[in-house]
Amino acid sequence: MADFVNIALPKGRLGEKVYSMFEAAGYPCPSIKENNRKLIYENSEVGVRYFWVKPSDVSIYVERGAADIGVAGKDILLEYCPDVYELLDLKTGVCRMMVAAMEDYRSDPDKTLRVATKFPNIARSYYDRQRREIDIITLNGSIELAPILGLSDVIVDIVETGKTLYENHLAPFE
């Protein structure tokens, strides 16, 4: 079996952008662009093996040695604090962590703040610094629904353009 560099790519837009960077750098894998359900894509000519994984799992594959290289967002590194070496910032998929709420929301500092997020460690750290009592509601998707349906007061989520927030009458809160 040939020696390969194993590269964990995050599924989705970021992964597609990053694969294009590897391809442009001379590490193509034409089969990755085929419409199929393969899990692993190899190019033995350049010694590269790519696999798509859930973004939150990229660092686990690297930390546990299944991948030599992984590309993950800073949000993943901050949330999970994996024991990995951060080589560089690719300056792609630029996003920001944001607290948002319904446009008309007014906070009551004497009341426990209900915070919906898929980043409970980041949210807890932020509100600990604010000395604010919170109740974290951990969700795995559609975080914006939580304040709309009254599940939470605010959300802590990663935002690229903010379009989804504004289209759903949410606004930056803090």
Predicted regions and their residues:
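Domain-level signature for soluble enzymes in the chorismate/prephenate branch of the shikimate pathway
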Residues: 1-174
